Structures are given as C-alpha cells and as structure tokens.
Amino acid sequence: MGQLMKEYRQQQKKRRADKNRKKVYVASRYAGDVKTNTQAAIHYCRFVIKKGLMPIASHLLYPQILDDNKPADRELGLAFGLALLGLCDEVWVFGPVSRGMAAEIEEAKRLNKPLRCFKEVGV
C-alpha cells in the first residue's frame, strides 16, 4: 500500500506542476497559405512545449469551429483569441506580422504581457 500511495502522490505533484506551467500565447500567421501556416503554428507550439511551457494557439482551435472565410466568424475568432491572450502569462510572436497578429501584439502591450519575437523557428 505504501508504494501505491507514493505513486499517487507523485502523480498529483506532476498534475499540479503541469497545471501551473506558464501559459504562452502563440501568435503566428494563419490566413493565406493556411496549410503551411497551420503546420508552422503546430511547430511553434512544440517549440513552446520543449521550453517547458504551455502553448495557447487560438488560430489552431477556432478555424476548426468557425468559418474564417466569413467576416463575422473571423471577427468572432479574433475576439476569442484576444480573450485567450488575456489569460496567458506571455505572448510569443513567430515570423512576419500579419494584421491579425498586429492586433494581438497591441493587446499584449495594453495588458503589459511580456512579449517575445522570434524569426520563423526551424520550419
């Protein structure tokens, strides 16, 4: 029974550590070459994970639910993304800045979020 409790405590400790990881909002291009940009965003999220942090990439989530070709849906997705950005500890920007990314950068500055900019990382 002692070993079982030890394993349980270790699992609980790991869950708490995972839950308390810093959250990083990943800002990168989506529109245009969607397939290439999606693959790049996935790569950037993996980069964040390798740094021991939790990536939040709204542009990998909301296009699955909303139609990015409909202006109202696109605006809603951007608004949801900015709301998620507010929950994050930092904002990391990857590659050239698009119009949507510029709005994310402005929101990060408004909220005094630490902002890190990267060239395209190993895509």
Model regions: which residues?
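Catalytic phosphate/metal-binding cores of nucleic-acid and nucleotide-processing enzymes, i.e., regions
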Residues: 1-123
